[in-house]
Amino acid sequence: MPTATPYEDLLRLVLDTGTPKSDRTGTGTRSLFGHQMRYDLNAGFPLITTKKVHTKSIVYELLWFLRGDSNVRWLQERGVTIWDEWASPTGDLGPVYGVQWRSWPTPSGEHIDQISAALDLLKRDPDSRRNIVSAWNVGEIPQMALPPCHAFFQFYVADGRLSCQLYQRSADLFLGVPFNIASYALLTHMMAAQAGLGVGEFIWTGGDCHIYDNHVEQVTEQLSRDPRPYPELVLAPRDSIFDYTYEDVVIKNYEPHPAIKAPVAI
């Protein structure tokens, strides 16, 4: 069975039909507004194969989010530097993803652990249409080093299988989106395991889907490569969603094409 290539198809679509736009970084982009990709999580783990993706950074970043952390020191100690450009001299990023996921502040001074609440709801009421986690806290965006790009996700259960849909307001297609697809696919597997469910789909919905002008050459090279079969995820059993370690996440048979370097737009 041929490997599904929704990500590569989106790259090609934006390259061919994207609208030239200016952007906050001053780099310039080709952009398309509104697109959806679907990945069957039973057909392999959706880690892009047309270039090598740094899986260590993906796994540690997700564990960092689940810790409720917003300081890059924990990542740096594990050799992950993907957030360094936005951090303060002390490593702080403000109330970014992990803080909102685990400790959303309420007007009464309490804090909501959205991940725990989502998992509890999966167990109590799997048919709920309210199982949503949001990082887009309007009142705290000015304090964030970078407003959330992957802002909002929803869980859905059908036939004993858990699916997740992410809304990503701003999608750096070459550098960022391969990370985001794999990260939320991994989170879906973790949540499903904790709720006693199988996995269904990961659905990615993008707002401003863009290729930076200084990534066009790299994207063209990537699209010249034939996609390979997706790898397999093996997740060790854990008692809590917050107990997972890097060693618990094993990605087998990942045989991608070589990595392609590109500058980050800050």
Curated annotation (Swiss-Prot):
Binding site for (6R)-5,10-methylene-5,6,7,8-tetrahydrofolate: 54, 172, 265
Annotated keywords: Cytoplasm, Methyltransferase, Nucleotide biosynthesis, Transferase
Residues that, per the record, bind dUMP: 24, 129-130, 169-172, 180, 210-212
Pathway: Pyrimidine metabolism; dTTP biosynthesis
SUPFAM superfamilies per UniProt: Thymidylate synthase/dCMP hydroxymethylase (SSF55831)
PROSITE patterns referenced in this protein's UniProt entry, alphabetically: THYMIDYLATE_SYNTHASE (PS00091)
Molecular function terms from GO: thymidylate synthase activity
Pfam families found in the cross-reference section: Thymidylat_synt
GO cellular component: cytosol
Enzymatic reactions: dUMP + (6R)-5,10-methylene-5,6,7,8-tetrahydrofolate = 7,8-dihydrofolate + dTMP
Subcellular location: Cytoplasm
The enzyme's E.C. designation: 2.1.1.45
Gene3D superfamilies, sorted: Thymidylate synthase/dCMP hydroxymethylase domain
Family designation: Belongs to the thymidylate synthase family. Bacterial-type ThyA subfamily.
NCBIfam families reported for this sequence: PRK01827.1-3, PRK01827.1-5, thym_sym
Subunit text: Homodimer.
Its job: Catalyzes the reductive methylation of 2'-deoxyuridine-5'-monophosphate (dUMP) to 2'-deoxythymidine-5'-monophosphate (dTMP) while utilizing 5,10-methylenetetrahydrofolate (mTHF) as the methyl donor and reductant in the reaction, yielding dihydrofolate (DHF) as a by-product. This enzymatic reaction provides an intracellular de novo source of dTMP, an essential precursor for DNA biosynthesis.
The protein's name in its UniProt record: Thymidylate synthase
Organism: Mycolicibacterium gilvum (strain PYR-GCK)
Gene responsible for this protein: thyA
